[in-house]
Amino acid sequence: MARTATRFSCTACGESLPKWEGRCPSCDAWGTVQEEATTLSAARRGHAAPREVVALADVDALEAERIATGLGELDRVLGGGIVPGSLVLLGGEPGVGKSTLLTMALAAIAQRTSALLVTGEESAAQVRLRAERIGGAGDIRVVAETDLDGVVATIAKERPAVCVVDSVQTLWTADLASAPGSVAQVREAAGALLRVAKEHGVAIILVGHVTKDGAVAGPKVLEHLVDAVLLFEGERGGELRILRAAKNRFGATSELGVFAMTGRGLEAVEDPSALLGRDELGAVGSVVACTLEGSRPLLLEVQALVSTSCLLYTSPSP
């Protein structure tokens, strides 16, 4: 017999509370504590079987072969490719090109192994239109689904090498009374996908939108669950896109990937320093400095403009 339990959580930081409060004691945000209703099964409480314990020295230390995405800039940030069984979160503002980036990666992966795209924001026909624009609609398998249980069952049945879920905010489960995109729904979806990824060795990439507060997929509870957090950034109206890792359990977090958005999708920018105008280097008021982002040197140009003034300035009195 199932019973319903009520708890409270902060929509800003994800902190769980035993009762409602006007201000969250963890992040000091006002009016962010909301009620959550969860369903508990009485048949499962207190009936968990003990698990087998092994010595750490007896565990096989075989390093799993990474799955190359076919995009050099993405592989650079990931540390050489996607690790099987890992859970990766790709965050960025809406419209920056997250779906385009992952569709291109899936198209390259599908030529060598199985790849699955779970879409909750678009229909299968809309996904095909985008894939045809970038020239990779052939081998990608796609399913349009937002029910969490259905998504988990599909991944467990298909067992693709790489699966992309676009996006995590659209997933929901009937076990929770809150709306899709809430703290409880996002946390439950990430936990369920983490379990299926580890159990079946499927590399899962979650797409999460950045909120107005700068958090990826809502509160930061997701960032503690996943193995890697990638941030995809770009200026509004500009063509350059920057990919960086905020967290990576299987590689460095200092690497940087640079892309350019074109009519055929994203193109890798292997030498960002070449974007500087060679003819303008050495001009008056301009200086070029070199900085290091991971293993990549980057040239940065700083400009200063100085002109004469018509105003009269008096010298300070001694």
Report the location of each language-model feature:
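Short, small/acidic-rich helices and loops at N termini and domain boundaries
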Residues: 2-45
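Extended interfacial segments that mediate partner engagement and assembly in macromolecular machines
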Residues: 37-117, 121, 125-126, 144-145, ...
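Conserved P-loop NTPase
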Residues: 40, 44-56, 157-158, 169, ...
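Conserved inter-motif catalytic segment of the P-loop NTP-binding fold
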Residues: 85, 93-96, 100-105, 109-195
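Conserved nucleotide-binding/hydrolysis micro-motifs of P-loop NTPases
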Residues: 96, 121-125, 146-149, 169-171, ...
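Conserved P-loop NTPase nucleotide-binding/switch module
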Residues: 162-244
